[in-house]
Structures are given as C-alpha cells and as structure tokens.
Amino acid sequence: MNAPQQVAVSPDTEIKMQDALKAQQASYLQEGYVSAETRIDRINRAIDVLVRHADRISDAIDQDFAGRPHQINLMTDVAASIGSMKHCRKHLKKWMKAEKRPSTFPLGLLGGRSRIHYQPKGVVGIVAPWNFPVAMIFQPLAGAL
C-alpha cells in the first residue's frame, strides 16, 4: 500500500465544483424523461468502456496498489462492474414499468386510475472508497444510468 499524500487544492475548487453541479442539473432538467432505450444505450456504452480499457484499468490499479495481480483487478473491478451493468440492463424495463394502485374514494367511483411512475431523481454523486476504485464507482453507476 502506498503512503498517504497531501494534495494541494486551489481556492476556487469549490466554485468549480458548484459550477459543474449546476451544469449537470441544468442538463438533466433540459433532457427531461429518459426512455428505457436511452438508458440501456448508456449502460451498453459503459460496458464497452470497461471492456475496451480493461487492461489499462488494471495497469492503473496495479500502479496504485503496487503489485495487485492483473487477474484480481480484472475480476474484482472490471468483471464485477460489467456484471452489475448487465444485471441492471436485464431488469431495467421491468423496474421502469408503471404500477397500478387502487384509487381512493371518490376518484375510484368517478373512473379515476392511480399508477406509480418511477422516475430518476436527478443528478447523482458517487463517492467511492480507495480499495476497489472502479467497482465502487461503476456498480452504483449501473443503477444511476
């Protein structure tokens, strides 16, 4: 394991982070409802990134951890992340499907119908620990996409 390092942070880092968050929130609001097909495409592109760059990801992890075996990196970070992405892709349409609920009085008598429509909450920040850096980002990202 490497020794801790002090990292200098410029004074305007918080301002830059706030600006980035505001830009992401504005983009989310502008995009509106995202279809299952769009979300599946995003998951597929994330899987593609992991597959295409698996060796580079493993090399970077190896540099950080000073000798973690290549196969372990591929299994714990890359393959585990791809598995989570595939699981979400497989179940996404079912998870997004609206659910019927009984309408309360008097709406039920008047022909009213009640449904729950699942929607994304907005911009999500994922904070990951250092020990499995790729898996701890991409696994929750699968659900966020």
Task: Show the residue positions of the predicted features.
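N-terminal Rossmann-like NAD(P)+-binding subdomain of aldehyde/semialdehyde dehydrogenases
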Residues: M1-R113
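Conserved small-residue-rich beta-alpha loop and adjacent elements
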Residues: T104-L145
